[in-house]
């Protein structure tokens, strides 16, 4: 069974987005800014009382998956293409869930040695998902 963990929003300016969530929603930074070398983006977790509600990510280059998605959905109402990027879930049996997805024709991506994996958007009605093991 999947348990919702947090969602990730792609933004064009991480610093201004952090301030926006602090001012509008009273959230606090739960983590320091972190750089992800694989996806080439910077991120920060936001939430309340040390608990993550959402992650904000900003692409570090123009040719990343995050940047390409933002460019593809930019329009006159959303000139920077910002918006929900990923839904993160936790599960007791990530291996079983991965096998179920693949045995039913779904596509997943994972790095060697990692228990978390990503569900390709074409397999989940274009909702990019990360499934990670529950801590403990």
Question: What positions do the PLM features span?
Answer:
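A cross-kingdom feature marking solvent-exposed beta-strand/loop segments within repeated
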Residues: 27-42, 63-79, 102-104, 109-116, ...
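N-terminal beta-strand motif that seeds the catalytic metal site of vicinal oxygen chelate
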Residues: 1-18, 82-89, 135-136
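Conserved N-terminal glycine/acidic-rich loop preference
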Residues: 1, 8, 35-57
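Conserved active-site tyrosine of GNAT-family acetyltransferases
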Residues: 17-22, 101
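Short, solvent-exposed interaction modules
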Residues: 72-92, 97-99
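Vicinal oxygen chelate
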Residues: 45-47, 54-55, 88, 95-136
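Residue-level marker for the onset of beta-strands and adjacent loop->beta junctions
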Residues: 5, 42-43, 85, 115
């Amino acid at each position: 069974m999947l348990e919702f963990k947090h969602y990730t929003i792609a933004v064009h300016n991480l610093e201004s987005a952090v301030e926006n969530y602090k001012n509008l929603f009273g959230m606090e930074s739960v983590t320091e800014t972190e750089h992800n070398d694989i996806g080439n983006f910077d991120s920060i977790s936001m939430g309340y009382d040390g608990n993550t509600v959402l992650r904000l990510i900003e692409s570090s280059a123009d040719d990343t998956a995050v940047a390409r998605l933002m460019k593809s959905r930019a329009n006159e109402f959303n000139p920077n293409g910002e918006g929900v990027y990923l839904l993160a879930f936790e599960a007791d049996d990530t291996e079983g869930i991965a096998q179920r997805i693949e045995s039913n024709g779904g596509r997943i991506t994972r790095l060697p040695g990692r228990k978390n994996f990503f569900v390709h958007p074409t397999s989940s009605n274009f909702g990019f998902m990360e499934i990670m093991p529950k801590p403990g």
